[in-house]
Regions:
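A generic local structural motif
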Residues: 6, 33-35, 243
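Positively charged n-region of N-terminal signal peptides that target proteins for export
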Residues: 1-4
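Active-site-adjacent loops and short helices of periplasmic peptidoglycan-processing enzymes
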Residues: 20-187, 191-197, 209-212
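Cleavable N-terminal signal peptides
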Residues: 7-8, 18
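Domain-terminus/edge residues, biased toward the C-terminal soluble/receptor-binding domains
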Residues: 163-167, 175-180, 184-397
Length: 397
């Protein structure tokens, strides 16, 4: 059984998508030509630009190329730390005794002193804002006992997020041949961090932090240059070049860019800004349906009820070229014969969103409630109905 849900509007473009069988739609309009220029050329070795809500890759180059993450590693370090906070395993007020290893870490520092006690909250700020390698190791040791064991945790989280081309050896990003990631994996991580921990994500927008009488400023200069930018993290080593993961929100649209392997701190800012401006200028994101919203009904045989509502497990967003919303088409395909029992969230069909005959999203339609088996009499009655339905179909009636 196929039901077509479509909207190709010319006048009512401001309306939300609706089911075709609930309105009388005009004849299909000819697709409106749209021109989207190619992404800007960048000086980055690898980059990716995605929409946060839909996950659509808007532009990319060498997004699966294995690279050294440098201090972008600390995005995962922070993700693990915040998960530990959320799970109640540590608290912001925990006092951490600074080990000699943490104190003597090379590279960027928050200038903690060996043997002194520092709160988890201050260490997080020292890691996120000041990119302190000393703070990162201190947090790793507090959570896992050693940086090596903490790296195992990092890899477990990477695996759970689907970061299939990433492997961590430390909490800082200091060079190691077995410590690597990709632009796409970093975008997955950034998206997960923002989605799961929106309150803690606000730490990444802070421009400065003072500890032990020393004020240091966030190295992400886009926080000053572009008011829509509210994170995330810079990175640099000689071998990795200058890197930056950025997120920006304008109106209801949030983009995430990852720029890797540029030649200078100034260049990573310029290339990131190029990508963000391109995405916001030429694309738009729409929320089509909410999770759990009743979108259609499926016929249920041999059940206590004859129909069940269908919807989506998650909110459905699509990212499309600007001005193309009215050319979206939505179709649903529902399984032709569904017999009780039916579980809640059981897949019973599929929703397809297309733009100008190109599929841009496919999601499962799931039952919004369970349906129990009907009585013996109800089963017999439905079996008779199915028999007649089959005979009529065979006769072409």
């Amino acid at each position: 059984m196929v039901k077509t849900l479509g909207f190709i509007f010319t006048f009512f473009a401001f309306l939300s998508p609706v089911w075709a069988d609930s309105i009388q739609t005009p004849p299909p309009a000819q697709p409106v030509p749209h021109v989207v220029p190619s992404p800007p050329k960048t000086a980055a070795e690898a980059y990716i630009l995605i929409d946060y809500n839909s996950g659509k890759i808007i532009a990319s180059q060498n997004a699966d190329m294995r690279v050294e993450p440098a201090s972008l590693t600390k995005i995962m370090t922070g993700y693990v730390v915040i998960n530990e906070l959320s799970n109640g395993n540590i608290s912001l007020d925990d006092m951490v005794t600074i080990s000699p290893k943490a104190w003597k870490m090379p590279g960027s520092k928050m200038f903690i002193e060996v043997g002194k006690k520092v709160s988890v909250h201050d260490l997080i700020k020292g890691m996120v804002i000041q990119s302190g390698n000393d703070a990162s190791v201190a947090l790793a040791e507090h959570i896992a006992g050693s940086e090596e064991v903490f790296a195992e945790l990092m890899n477990k989280y990477a695996e759970s997020l689907g970061m299939t081309h990433t492997h961590y050896m430390n909490a800082t990003g200091l060079p190691n041949p077995d410590h690597y990631t990709t632009a796409e994996d970093l975008s997955i991580l950034a998206r997960a961090l923002i989605n799961k921990f929106p309150e803690e994500y606000e730490w990444y927008a802070q421009k400065k932090f003072t500890f032990n009488g020393i004020t240091q400023y966030n190295r992400n200069k886009l926080l000053w240059q572009d008011p829509s930018v509210d994170g995330l993290k810079t990175g640099h080593t000689e071998s990795a070049g200058y890197c930056l993961v950025t997120s920006a929100k304008r109106d209801d649209m949030r983009l995430i860019s990852v720029v890797l392997g540029t030649d200078s701190a100034k260049q990573r800012i310029q290339e990131s800004q190029k990508l963000l401006n391109y995405g916001f200028r030429f694309f738009e994101t729409h929320k089509l349906y909410q999770a759990g919203q009743r979108l259609n009904d499926a016929r249920i045989w041999e059940g206590q009820q004859d129909t069940v509502g269908l919807g989506l497990e998650n909110d459905l967003y699509v990212t499309i070229p600007r001005g193309q919303y009215k050319n979206l088409k939505i179709e649903s395909t529902i399984d032709p014969k569904i017999t009780a029992p039916v579980n809640a969230d059981q897949p019973l069909g599929e929703l397809t969103v297309s733009l100008n005959d190109e599929t841009i999203s496919q999601k499962q339609l799931v039952s919004l409630s369970p349906v129990e088996e009907g009585s013996f009499f109800k089963k017999i009655l439905d079996q008779i109905k199915l028999l007649f339905k089959s005979l009529l179909g065979f006769l072409g009636l």
